[in-house]
Every structure is written in structure tokens, then in C-alpha cells.
């Protein structure tokens, strides 16, 4: 039994980020329903680490539903350096958002977790029941524990107040409006920026690490469509993994090759094995998603990479980098 569809005012935190922009696009392209009012906010509208600003935002908007995307995020190397900052800022943001949603009587909150929060030592594929089964990878334990606490809070809000607060766990998201910063972004947007620079300067492409780790990549526009489905139809408090199938996992080397092909790069490609690989794999099961949506069609990886590369090239000046 899903949400009763009727008058809904949906507040999306982190609305200017990768996933927020994708949801905006999907809604604008026809996924929004009559009676739905979508309100996208970013850090310009309120500092969500500040309880008073967060409360004021929620009092003003009076959302019936919330998609909570706002977070302090960064790539592997920034996480290693600033674990305390990632823990504190995200704990503050999440507590402020969930409690403000509760105070204004929001009927549903869908927060965003990440597969990097799962235990470092685990069996594969990982699934929704394993989140708290052991410590996360040491490289980003601050971010991971802060995100795990959303699941703890969701269960507690349900137990104590009957709230339908839930969370989704996407795998590696990429697409337009990503952070393409080479030092600080995630692997695929970093590769796209690197290939762009190598191509424009006629130099070799150096990929950090061995290229062997494997990842499941999900296109932001596919994730946006799934987020909207979760908001309307998914009524469990337990989280749900949003991902392509295990069979669609690709190596970093294959991802680099897809970017090289999409951007028509003809230079030399080398792998710098002195750089850290991070986790070798974090294969996730999308069995739960498929039990609900057996026929959902994901955008083919190469097509999604091509669309993202085209967006980055066309919007190079404005892109986050």
C-alpha cells in the first residue's frame, strides 16, 4: 500500500546537487503529478547544520513529504583527511532535518544513504539487512557512521512516533551536475574531467589506482525516477538499495574506457598503482528493488556515460570542478 496520492508538498534538501538536479529534471519532464508541489532548496536557502535555520525553513515550507539529499560529501582522499568534519556536519544536518520534519508533521521522509556505509569485511552481495554488521571501511568511517545513524533514527521515529521515515541506498551515482573535481570528486566524474583535460592539452591520461576495483554505477536520472517511486509507493521503514544488478558491475578500467570512447580520446592511458584503490568491491544486491519493480529499465551504462560527458563538455564553464 503506497502513499495516498493527493495534495503533496515535497521539500527536497540538497536540491542543487547531482541527485537533486536529476529529480528536478525528471519532475519537469513530466514525472510530477497533479496536486504535487515540489520545493527544491540548497545551502543558499538555509544552513542545515544550524537547528534554528532548519526549523525556520520547514516552518516556512510546511512540507507533507521530504526527500533529504543534503550532506557534506567528498571523494576518497578528502574523506581520509577529514573524518571528524564529515561525522559532525552530517550528524547535525540529519538530526536537524529529521526532527524539523517531525515537528511540522511531515507524512514521509526519504533520506539518502550510500553503499560505502556497509561493513568493510562482509560477504557479497551486500543487502539491506547488513548495514550494522561491522565497522565500515576506515577511509571514510566518519561519513559512514553519520549516514548509518539515519537508519537508526528512522527506526526510532517509527517506534516512538509511528513516522514513515525511510532511506534509500544508491550505489555509485553519476550524471549531469556532478562534482567533477579531480582531487575531491567521485571516480567517474573525476575521470570525465581528466579525459577532457588530457584531450585538450594533448597529453596522456593517468588513472589513479590499478583500475581493478569494481563498482555498480547508477545514472542520476534513473535514480531520480526511483526516488519518486519510493516517495509515492514504498512504505517500509527499512532501507532499500537502488542499484543496477550485480551483473552490471564494471571495473574502474572499464569505466575509464567508456569515458575515453565517449569523449573520443586517442591518447595514451596509464594506471598509477601508487594511488589507493579504496575498497576492491562493494557489490550490492538489487533483489529487494526487483521484487517491487521487476520491469524497471536502467539506462545502458555507455549511453549514460556519453550523455554525462556531453553535458560536461557543453557546460564546462559552469560545472563544479
From Swiss-Prot:
Marked site: Important for catalytic activity: 114, 116
Swiss-Prot/TrEMBL catalytic activity: GDP-beta-L-fucose + NADP(+) = GDP-4-dehydro-alpha-D-rhamnose + NADPH + H(+)
Which residues are listed under the site Lowers pKa of active site Tyr?
147
- Indicate the residues that form the catalytic site: 143
Q: Which UniProt keywords apply?
A: Isomerase, Multifunctional enzyme, NADP, Oxidoreductase, Tumor antigen
One example of the protein's molecular function in GO is:
isomerase activity
- Which positions are annotated as binding NADP(+)? 14-20, 147, 170-173, 186
- Protein family per UniProt: Belongs to the NAD(P)-dependent epimerase/dehydratase family. Fucose synthase subfamily.
Primary role: Catalyzes the two-step NADP-dependent conversion of GDP-4-dehydro-6-deoxy-D-mannose to GDP-fucose, involving an epimerase and a reductase reaction.
| Name listed for the protein in its UniProt record | GDP-L-fucose synthase
Organism encoding this protein: Mus musculus (Mouse)
Amino acid at each position: 500500500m503506497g502513499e495516498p496520492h493527493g495534495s503533496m508538498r515535497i521539500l527536497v534538501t540538497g536540491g542543487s546537487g547531482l541527485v537533486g538536479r536529476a529529480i528536478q529534471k525528471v519532475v519537469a519532464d513530466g514525472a510530477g503529478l497533479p496536486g504535487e508541489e515540489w520545493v527544491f532548496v540548497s545551502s543558499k536557502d538555509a544552513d542545515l547544520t544550524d537547528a534554528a535555520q532548519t526549523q525556520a525553513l520547514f516552518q516556512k515550507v510546511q512540507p507533507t513529504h521530504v526527500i533529504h539529499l543534503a550532506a557534506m560529501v567528498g571523494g576518497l582522499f578528502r574523506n581520509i583527511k577529514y573524518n571528524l568534519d564529515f561525522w559532525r556536519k552530517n550528524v547535525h544536518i540529519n538530526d536537524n532535518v529529521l526532527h524539523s520534519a517531525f515537528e511540522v508533521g511531515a507524512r514521509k521522509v526519504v533520506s539518502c544513504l550510500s553503499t560505502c556505509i556497509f561493513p568493510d569485511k562482509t560477504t557479497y552481495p551486500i543487502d539491506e539487512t547488513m548495514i550494522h554488521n561491522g565497522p565500515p571501511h576506515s577511509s571514510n568511517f566518519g561519513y559512514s557512521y553519520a549516514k548509518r545513524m539515519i537508519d537508526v533514527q528512522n527506526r526510532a521515529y517509527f517506534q516512538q512516533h509511528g513516522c514513515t521515515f525511510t532511506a534509500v541506498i544508491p550505489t555509485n551515482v553519476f550524471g549531469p551536475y556532478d562534482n567533477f573535481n579531480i582531487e575531491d570528486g567521485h571516480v567517474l566524474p573525476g575521470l570525465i574531467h581528466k579525459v577532457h583535460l588530457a584531450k585538450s592539452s594533448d597529453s596522456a591520461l593517468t588513472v589513479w589506482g590499478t583500475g581493478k576495483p569494481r563498482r555498480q554505477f547508477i545514472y542520476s536520472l534513473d535514480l531520480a525516477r526511483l526516488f519518486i517511486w519510493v516517495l509515492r509507493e514504498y512504505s517500509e521503514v527499512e532501507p532499500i538499495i537502488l542499484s543496477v544488478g550485480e551483473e552490471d558491475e564494471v571495473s574502474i578500467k572499464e569505466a575509464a574506457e567508456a569515458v575515453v570512447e565517449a569523449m573520443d580520446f586517442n591518447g595514451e592511458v596509464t594506471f598509477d598503482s601508487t594511488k589507493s584503490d579504496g575498497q576492491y568491491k562493494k557489490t550490492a544486491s538489487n533483489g529487494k528493488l526487483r521484487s517491487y519493480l521487476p520491469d524497471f529499465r536502467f539506462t545502458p551504462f555507455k549511453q549514460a556515460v556519453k550523455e554525462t560527458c556531453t553535458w560536461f563538455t557543453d557546460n564546462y564553464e559552469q560545472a563544479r570542478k
